[in-house]
């Protein structure tokens, strides 16, 4: 025991040296909370435990967990008595491609260089990104696609993107590639054994590299992590190499990924894809029938459906209308006949896609209680059949946490209110004992650099009314003028955003940019402008950085409560009272989303910003005032617009107004 304690002490001593000496010498700041966070993470890894780490904006959590993993590997042979050179990597799972790219191109090379120069490593750190086949180029299929479009009048930009795949293996790294070209040029779900391109296949070379014992980090997204876990649970070949520890960054997104992986869906694009692959097998007439049946079914559903409520992503969810049941049954019968006709005549993976569609239709017809069954309509009016498993936390526990490896789950929004109860519930850790919890506060001085403005004159107005849009437009106009532009306005509804923007079109003396559903081009345009107003919803609540004076005013129009949908209704059934459900589920989820939005305000130590909340429920006598203040960092408070003007004048220099 004494030896183990000594090795652990030495490992923690190296944390101090790395963050107090080596990284500052390389240009980074000393951050006490970052150091404390790394100690917590290292402790959990070396004691084979799970830790939940809520890391505030600007902490530098990536360096914290990478350093903890490096030292865990270095001292594991001494501390735990098993071979530290057994070839087992650490898996880092993230939600975003941007973070994966940053880890492999920036964080790992930088940290490796610093530690090598200090003789804390024997060799460079090696990492590889692992993701599904559909993210990589199949050279054989690419050659076929290029030949097919050689003499066609194809869009020149898309053509150049397609040609660039000869040199770019990762599809995610190529811009302007059409979705159709992407589907036709990617590695198929099942590679034929006698593939003529096998000898020089870049994908196979990538797999060979990723299996080498000198790979320290395997980086993947949450879906790939869960797919690997499902493979292991079902006795299939794992997708990832056996790993000694797991880091789940952006861990607040893990339950959403689990909903996708442990459920099933079928929409228009899925049907089109299946039809295309049927045509490649000379079964084009069958594919055409499939598309016709699905189109007719969608039309029948639209005739009988009841309106749903638009969520923050601009989608509507609603239950399957009974009036469309007879056509669904007829479509299922036709599909079963098609499956019998095609048995043994098409590749198994295409055949399995048809079987899965048949199973999903069957769940809807018999109202299978294992799943939350509903339809989802996107902004284009396309419908998707959705089946979400009711026991996602149970599956996460069974396929991940019960396997006994140490794990770090980290994000800026794991904590809600006073604790981690909601996160434990959603991630399957509710029944796990010995799970550690850590909160590392942001190093930013919010009391000095951030003003929280909640107007004193807010009043409840009928939701969706003209009066509501007019009141909000007036408040936003006054704020934009008070802060001289430099504004991000976050909405929870695209409909409300459109209404308010129309009212303000001729009232704001600054350029206005409106982001509709993941429009990266519009965000890039806003960033190039010296001073503008960005209206946004959906994905802009998180994962988008606007450092400096670009966003000096963040306006949160409505508190980000989840809309009532079939998933939330199913959760509501588990509680005896509505109030209990609201306090246990609804409020913590709102607090997490609010913190994500608030995080767009201050991105560096030098940033200064006014954050305004225009929802009467956050006002002094509002129902959720205490919940709002509990979720946010301590800031100076304001109720009058004059205080906003004074704050901006006191914090900004002359060029801000030019």
Regions found by a protein language model. Name each.
Residues 65-67, 71, 98-101, 105-111, ...:
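Signature of the SF2 helicase/ATPase Hel1-core->accessory helical subdomain module
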Residues 2-24, 29, 76-218, 222, ...:
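A substrate-engagement module of RecA-like helicase motors
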Residues 492-516:
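Conserved helicase motor "Helicase C" RecA-like lobe of SF1/SF2 P-loop NTPases
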Residues 189-216, 229-237, 337-456, 468, ...:
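A contiguous, basic/glycine-rich beta-loop/short-helix subdomain that forms a polymer-engagement track
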């Amino acid at each position: 025991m004494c030896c183990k304690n000594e090795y652990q002490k030495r490992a923690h001593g190296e944390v101090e040296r790395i963050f107090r000496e080596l990284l500052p010498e390389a240009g980074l700041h000393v951050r006490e909370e970052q150091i404390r966070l790394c100690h917590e993470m290292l402790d959990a890894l070396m004691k084979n435990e799970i830790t939940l780490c809520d890391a505030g904006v600007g902490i530098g959590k990536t360096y914290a967990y990478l350093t903890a993993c490096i030292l865990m590997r270095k001292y594991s042979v001494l501390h735990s008595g098993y071979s530290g050179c057994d070839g087992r990597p650490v898996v880092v799972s993230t939600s975003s491609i941007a973070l994966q790219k940053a880890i492999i191109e920036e964080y790992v090379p930088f940290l490796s260089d610093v530690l090598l120069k200090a003789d804390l490593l024997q060799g460079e750190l090696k990492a590889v990104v692992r993701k599904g086949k559909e993210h990589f180029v199949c050279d054989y299929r690419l050659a076929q696609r290029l030949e097919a479009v050689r003499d066609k009048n194809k869009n020149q930009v898309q053509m150049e993107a397609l040609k660039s795949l000869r040199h770019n293996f990762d599809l995610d790294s190529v811009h302007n590639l059409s979705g159709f070209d992407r589907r036709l040029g990617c590695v198929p779900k099942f590679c034929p054994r006698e593939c003529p391109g096998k000898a020089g296949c870049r994908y196979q070379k990538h797999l060979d590299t990723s299996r080498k014992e000198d790979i320290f980090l395997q980086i993947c997204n949450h879906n790939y992590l869960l797919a690997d876990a499902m493979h292991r649970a079902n006795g299939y070949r794992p997708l990832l190499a056996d790993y000694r520890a797991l880091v789940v960054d952006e861990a607040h997104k893990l339950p959403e990924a689990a909903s996708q992986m442990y459920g099933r869906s079928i929409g228009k694009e899925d049907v089109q894809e299946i039809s295309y692959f049927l045509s490649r097998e000379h079964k084009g007439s069958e594919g055409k029938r499939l598309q016709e049946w699905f189109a007719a079914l969608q039309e029948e559903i639209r005739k009988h459906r009841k309106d749903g409520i638009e969520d923050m992503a601009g989608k509507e969810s609603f239950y399957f209308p009974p009036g469309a049941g007879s056509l669904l049954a007829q479509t299922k019968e036709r599909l079963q006949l098609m499956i019998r006709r095609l048995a043994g005549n098409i590749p198994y993976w295409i055949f399995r896609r048809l079987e899965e569609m048949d199973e999903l239709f069957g769940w809807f017809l018999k109202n299978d209680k294992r799943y939350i069954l509903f339809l989802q309509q996107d902004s284009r009016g396309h419908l998707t059949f959705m089946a979400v498993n009711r026991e996602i936390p149970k599956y996460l526990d069974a396929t991940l946490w019960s396997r006994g490896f140490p794990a770090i789950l980290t994000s800026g929004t794991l904590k809600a209110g006073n604790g981690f109860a909601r996160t434990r519930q959603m991630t399957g850790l509710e029944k796990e004992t010995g799970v550690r919890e850590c909160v590392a506060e942001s190093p930013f001085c919010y009391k000095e650099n951030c003003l929280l403005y909640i107007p004193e004159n807010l009043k409840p107005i009928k939701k969706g009314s003209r009066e509501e849009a007019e009141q909000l437009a007036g408040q936003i106009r006054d704020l934009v003028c008070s802060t001289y532009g430099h504004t991000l306005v976050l909405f929870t509804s695209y409909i409300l955003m459109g209404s308010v923007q129309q009212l303000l079109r001729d009232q704001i003396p600054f350029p206005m940019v409106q982001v509709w559903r993941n429009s990266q081009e519009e965000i890039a345009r806003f960033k190039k402008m010296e001073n503008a107003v960005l209206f946004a919803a959906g994905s802009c609540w998180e994962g988008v950085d606007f450092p400096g004076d670009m966003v000096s005013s963040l306006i949160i129009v409505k508190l980000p409560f989840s809309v009532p949908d079939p998933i939330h209704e199913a959760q509501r059934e588990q509680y005896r009272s509505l109030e209990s459900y609201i306090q246990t589920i609804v409020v913590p989820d709102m607090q997490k989303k609010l913190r994500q939005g608030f995080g767009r305000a201050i991105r560096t130590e030098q940033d200064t910003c006014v954050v305004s909340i225009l929802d009467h429920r956050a006002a002094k006598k509002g129902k959720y005032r205490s919940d709002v203040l509990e979720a946010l960092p301590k800031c100076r408070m304001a109720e009058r617009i004059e205080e906003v003007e004074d704050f901006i004048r006191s914090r900004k220099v002359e060029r801000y107004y030019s």
